[in-house]
Amino acid sequence: MSEPNRKPKSSAALLQSRRNALRSYLGAYGFMAPAGVLVLIFFLIPVAIVLYLSVTNLASSNFTSDLAKMEFIGLKNYRTLFNDQFARKIFFNTIFYVLVTLSLFNVSLALIVSLLTTHIDRSAGFVFRALWILPRITSPVVYILIWKRMAAEAPFGILNQFNELLGNPTYNYVATNPWVFVVVVNGFIGVSFGMIIFTSAIESIPKDLLNASLVDGSSRMQRIRYVILPLIRWPLLFVVTYQTLSLLTSFVEIQLLTDGGPGLYRTEVWSLTAFHRALSNYFGNAQWGYGSAFAVLLVMIGVVLAVIYMRVFRFDELVAEPRVEAL
Amino acid sequence: MEIRIDNLTKKFGDVVGVEDLTLHIDDGEFVAFLGPSGCGKTTTLLTLAGIYKPTDGLIRFGDRVVNTVQPKDRNIGMVFQSYALYPHMTIFQNIAYPLKLKKTPKNVQNEQVRQVANVMGIGELLDRRPGQLSGGQQQRVALGRALVKEPDVLLFDEPLSNLDARLRLTMRGEIKHLQKNLGITSIYVTHDQVEAMTMADRIAVMNRGHLQAFDAPDELYDRPKTRFVAGFVGNPPMNFLDVEVSPSNGHFLAQADSIQLPLGAERGAPPAGHGGPVVMGIRPEDIQIVDEGDVTGEIFVVEPLGREDLIDARVGPHGFILLADTEKQHRAGERVSLKFDMTQAQFFDPQTERSLLWRQ
Ligand SMILES: Nc1ncnc2c1ncn2[C@@H]1O[C@H](COP(=O)(O)OP(=O)(O)O)[C@@H](O)[C@H]1O
Ligand SMILES: [Mg+2]
């Protein structure tokens, strides 16, 4: 409130305004508290524990659940990791896996499915999208078993049974093309997320705008290029960001399909290594400390990537200005 | 461009958008589609634009049947109620978009966009985005975008409905002026009869997917061919009254309860010949409050409109809307004598709702 002749505020008024400020401050934190508690319990505390484990040599041979009794070894695990001859290979495996799956499936195929199913009859589009959600909602074990059955060696594999029927040579598909299978199997799961986001973004573009483009002289392809894609730019960037991070940390399907093989670390990715080292070492010795070092680096990579994405894609603008309104 | 629509039907599943519409529009003509919400105006317009495929019937632009021609190959400009500007493009890019799609050279694009922008008075706004413009400015941009490609046909879908009343009045004049200057065949969809009456050469009145009338504005007003048209065109709307018309010593008499109104042969003979009850229509401006009138009644409500008073007068069970000079200072409850100008009365068949005076 502005008064015409401003007098210095009385101390009572000053106290009152401080009290109001405090109240709105507490109100804001009150609303954030439930989410904050979840982040604390399920993210910050586990990160702190893993961080601590990564500077101990905790393993099955010297196991203890007492944090105080664990043996502190400084950065030795990290030194071992950087000198590990396979860590380099696993690192590039991870980049390859994330980039290829993301670009071919989680973004491109998701976009193609969304565009196709929004350009055909509504209910047919709905059915196709529902089919694409199946890999996501099927339990990973069942889903991977289906793929394994499909691709198994003769005489068990379905594909190979066809090969035999047709008199073609048979293949051990997964063993000969492990990366193709790892990418396709994960890609099929990854399509649904982008598909749902892109479809709802496309469907929220006002009909008038889409009609206007056709009347203005665009073909349907030109309308996608000049109107639809620019208008779903933010959902696109969001899916790229979110799916990069989610692919970085996913390993269950790879574990079930190839378990990082065949051979030494052919399809091993970083998050799977963390699991292997910490919980399922080939040599029967679970190295929790060493595995934690892998996990800590993964968290750091994830956080750095998230920050880079937010900077490059300027998500702060998205939050600052209601873009949706302009649609 | 001459447009001929023959027996056009467009259905969405079981829902009828428009049915059996036949309409021939002359080259350079300004035609309004007038009708209440949901009567099929937009459906017809989008079918003409090529967004919807006709379920049945023929649409011809000139001699070319365009039923299956893609929108981009029809050379039409369209203006939407929501403006439909591309939010991610600048105003310049919005107007240039149709030219870009036609692969017009950049320098020609530049020139034409600036020219159109100047005509529309938006030359200074070219670097802005649609979100930074007022509604009126956005509608000018939309109009500019429709005009820049020099279309053969202009389609308007309630372009002024989202503007305030003052702006609507200005834009009404400007659109009409532009259309006459450019001579582009135009179809203008509106539910506002004042817009239709003031702008159009001819008005197609639609109701529930059917064409009710297609005539010049004064024809529709003076010689409505259906009861719907009579009631829809004109503000305040026409009064309707169930009457019996019978000959009475050389004249005719329209009767309803205590009301008795004398009629000349020109207007009286057809309803009398029809036999049985008919619907009489009389416009508010054709009823006067006088000292010695045809009937006496009581004023029920007075609504001041500024220039005049809108009066709801009751005669027995029948109500009439009429207009009176504000200086007379009529008050509710006042007893008044009403004079009906029966040379302007309309008569309709109560079943078919067709006019008994004007045959289709
Ligand atoms: N895309 C559509 N799908 C189904 N029904 C529609 C569609 N478009 C319009 N309709 C129906 O067709 C009728 C006419 O609608 P419309 O042409 O939009 O009316 P108006 O523009 O005169 O208000 C309405 O009953 C409407 O519900
Ligand atoms: Mg409409």
Across the structure, where does each feature detected by a protein language model lie?
Chain B
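ABC ATPase nucleotide-binding domain
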Residues: R4, H24, R60, S337-K339
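ABC ATPase nucleotide-binding domains
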Residues: F30, P71-F228
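The feature captures the beta-strand-to-loop junction immediately N-terminal to the Walker
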Residues: L34-P36
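Helix-to-loop junction immediately C-terminal to a conserved catalytic motif
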Residues: A49
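Non-catalytic connector elements of ABC transporters
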Residues: P236-F240, P247-Q360
